[in-house]
Amino acid sequence: MSFSKKLKQLFTSTPSQNNWDGLIETYKTWLPVSNKTPIITLKEGATPLLEVKSISNRIGNGVKVFVKYDGLNPTGSFKDRGMTMAISKAKEAGCEAVICASTGNTSASAAAYASKAGMKSFVIIPDG
């Protein structure tokens, strides 16, 4: 399949959780992964694109405004989109643990993906 056809297919289809393999599997052609990269996924990314008709109507002129509802990602955050790659590459590099400074979404995502990878996770909570 040509590059343009594959790109068009990716952006014109709506994935469902039943047949979705996660972001890395879907976009690996354009990502820094190889056959040696362990794909650590929680099936992130198959979130709905929703039209916000009230805003579209206010703008007018046939403009349609859409939002991505990333609250439906595995840990409830868009952070899962990047964490799948971060933990996959850390695992590939031989890391046994990950660490982050966070009070919220990053730490939840890092802990979930590290657990899936069989890695330890450490969260540093900033003072204040």
Regions found by a protein language model. Name each.
Residues 1-128:
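PLP-dependent amino-acid enzyme catalytic core
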